[in-house]
Each structure stands twice: as C-alpha cells, then as structure tokens.
Amino acid sequence: MAKSKTKHRLCSQESSVSALLASCTLSGSNSSNSDGSFHYKDKLYRSASQALQAYIDDFDLGQIYPGASTGKINIDEDFTNMSQFCNYIYKPNNAFENLDHKKHSNFISCRRHTVNDIDSMSLTTDDLLRLPADGSFSYTYVGPSHRTSKKNKKCRGRLGSLDIEKNPHFQGPYTSMGKDNFVTPVIRSNINGKQCGDKIELLILKAKRNLEQCTEELPKSMKKDDSPCSLDKLEADRSWENIPVTFKSPVPVNSDDSPQQTSRAKSAKGVLEDFLNNDNQSCTLSGGKHHGPVEALKQMLFNLQAVQERFNQNKTTDPKEEIKQVSEDDFSKLQLKESMIPITRSLQKALHHLSRLRDLVDDTNGERSPKM
C-alpha cells in the first residue's frame, strides 16, 4: 500500500482492524531505515499491509483449526512525521496533564497550514499498527470544509469528554450569540494564558451567503401568498364552486315560425273548434259522440214509437186526404225507409244484446235459488 503523508491522517475510536489487533502485542524500534521492514514469524515484509495480511490469514486458520496460532509483528521503521503523530495525536487519558505546550503549539500551527479538507484524511496500515491494542483515541480533529487564503486558514481542535473532566485548567467550549442570532462556537484554554481556538467566522459567513441566495431565488408570489393548505385558503370562498347560471326567459314555440305556418296553425285550430262545437254533425265511420248501450236502446225505442204514431195517424185520416196525399206519403215513406235502414240494424243488435243479458240474468238467478 502506498504511504500517504501523515498530515492527512485521522483515527476512529472504534476500528475493526484495531479490534483485530487487540489480541497481539506490537513493539517498535527507532531505527533510521527509511524503507522500513516488518518481521512476522521469522519473515521479512517490506510493507505493513503484507505483514498484516499474513497475520489475518493465520488468525482465520486459528478459528478453523485450534492448533494454528498467530505470532507477533515487529516494526522496524520510524518517520519524523510519524513521531509527531504518535506524540501529539495519540495520548492517554491524562494527556493534558503532562502536555508539552511548545510541541503542542507547534503541532497545531503545522496542522493549520497543511489540512485543507476533512474528506481527504485517511489512515494507512502503518498508522493502524501504531494504534493501541484497545483502539482508544482521545483526540479528535475537526477542520474547515472550505478553502480560503493562507491567512484565513484556521484549525479547530476539540477535546474528548474524559480529558475535559480530568483537566481542571481547561475551559469547555461555549457559544456566543452574534448577529442574526447565529451561534458562534469558541474553544478556549488557559494554557500559558493563550487561546487555543477562535470563532468560526468563515463558516458563518458562508452559511449567511447561502441563506441570502436561497431567499433571493424564491419567487415573489411565494413570499406574499400563504400556503394553499392553510386555514385561510380552506375557509375562503371558492370561486370555482359558485359558477353563475344564466336563466333565459321562456320563448313561445311559434315565435320563430314563419307567418305562413302561424296562419296554418290558426286555421287548423279553428276547424277543430268548429268540429267539436257542431251538435248537428253527421255520424261517420271514425265516430262522433257515442252513447252507452242503454241510451242507444232508449233512443231506438223512441224512434220506433214516433214511427208507429205517424203510421197510425196516416190510417185514421180521411180517404180524400189519403188520395191527395198519396204522392206525398209515398215520398215520405221512401224517406222513412231510407232513414229506418240504419235504425233497424241497430235495433236488431240491441235486441240481440238484450236477449243475452236476459239469459245471463236468468242463469244467475237459477244458480242462487238452489243455494237458498
């Protein structure tokens, strides 16, 4: 694995690799070999990743076969920057009690100029091998996530909770209220009467600019109008529900017709009225006023009686008058015969119906008498 510079290195408190190394012991020597060498089970490895891979293989075999065991990894390398990493970054729980203030200030000033982006920080296998067996790490570094000029590049340090509790000369971070109610975190310490941290002004300025840009991009209508789901919108009048309906006055049917059609309609109406009001209307096949069967029989009987009276009156008259009136009587008889033809037919039908009614009445009377 390629060795990256120690200025971009960071350690996590819980690491799977450090947990794996908890069962082994590491020992280092201060040799001046720049290439470095790693000894594991009487074998020499040029990189720490190779030695660690061999150790992992033996560890897996030990899980399968109880007879297999892991050995020790001996580190024979020392870098100048690595010593700074071990002396300043990794500290026990009492790190700030035995702190060399000059080295600590030099380390922080060095880190201010070198660290640019927190995403670029990583640990190599060599750094992982130098960590303690329990994987503890009490110092965490937080750097700015943006780039500015060299004068504005600043480093922020944040201490663990355990170190704050044990160090009586340490003042924890406090927040100061700036303009626009922005919280400005500040880290201060009384080491040699100097401040170790300062305000994060650049981050606040960047946040302000982002907020201003977001508010400027919002449309004006969204600023003026409320949300459509608010109570005001729900309780307001809904124009789309109150659709105005126009009622037209009734128009007569014949208003748009031509004068010829109106005249025809009037003439037809007059004909119908005349036909209904005409009492002397002759009987036709399509009808007229039809009476009931009893009324028809009555009219037929009255007609027969009138004919008989006329016939009797004609017999009682004098013979002279009869001779004189022969021509007139013949003519009247002919007219009577012609007028009696439909009457006789209707009388025959009426007599037939009467006979049937009489039979029905007799039958019903005959059925009732035995029951009595």
UniProtKB/Swiss-Prot annotation:
A cellular component term, taken from the record's GO annotations: extracellular region
Signal peptide interval: 1-31
Stretches the record annotates as Disordered: 248-268
Subcellular location: Secreted
PTM sites of type Phosphoserine: 161
Keyword Phosphoprotein among record annotations: yes
Classification via PANTHER family: LUNG ADENOMA SUSCEPTIBILITY PROTEIN 2
Name this polypeptide is given: Lung adenoma susceptibility protein 2
Species this protein is from: Homo sapiens (Human)
Origin organism lineage: Eukaryota, Metazoa, Chordata, Craniata, Vertebrata
